[in-house]
Amino acid sequence: MAEATLARRRPSRRPAWAGFAFSSPWIIGLVVFMAGPILVSLYYSFTEFNLFQSPRWVGLKNYATLLEDPKFLGSVFNTAYLAIIGVPLGLAFALLVALALNFPVRGQPLYRAIVYLPAIVPVVTASYLWRWVFNAQYGYLNQVLGRVGLPQPNWLADPLWTKPAVLIIIWWGIGATAVIYLAALKQVPQQLYEAAAVDGANGWQRFWYVTWPALTPVTLFQLIMGVIAALQIFAPTYLLTQSRGNGANGGPGDSLLTYTMHLFHNAFVFLKMGQAAAMAWILFLVIGLLTLLILLTSRRWVHYGSE
């Protein structure tokens, strides 16, 4: 009798096996198409491999060679420049746009749609459009600058102006970030603003002590995603520096040679798959460490509703 009772209480393993069976296609796909290639790329990063010959083990040579490569160091600087300047200012611009869209004015839905529209334009289309806008001879931007008496820089041929041109393209697509900020603004209780007004808080104080703390969780998410995207930027710089029949060359003085573009050149132009794999793993570790650092420091400035 006791054995029969224990048998009835013993949990069945059929539901667990059924779950594994239903998820097995996804697990197999993950192992075959993601986990497997990732581990293979780690092996390739310690080899000399050009796709036509068998990989030859060279140890840490690829990593040491990269540290001595001026183009590698230049690509690190260019990418860091775009990330350090582009991400914080992009978040600031998006927040200002969201604050402006949060005011109850006539035609508000139309303004929101206009702001968000550039974010859904394909990056290839937007990059070619901006390439025409930045043209030094007949570009629309220089025509406007000339009419108001301002200098007309050679945006895509002068190393001093190539990075600002890319930053403009990046900031052009802040509509998605602004919409997320706008959604967060809608969640701030109006009672907090009313209480702050009763206490005599001015507009800046209401923003700093009421609005900003409520936006810090969203800012944390946007900061992490922005850093990851900036460190992997490829399409705008590649398309802006692309010349007819010669591919992309990194721009004047390699001023737009970003990390991922240099990785692409090593892999598919020079067929240095070992160095490309090493660069990919360096980028992976840098993104992971920066994400961890942001999460650890977020405890000091991110405020949640329950705190």
Tell where the protein language model's regions lie, with residue ranges.
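Short, Lys/Arg-rich, polar N-terminal cytosolic tail immediately upstream
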Residues: M1-R14
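A structural signal for multi-pass alpha-helical bundles of membrane permease subunits
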Residues: P15-E307
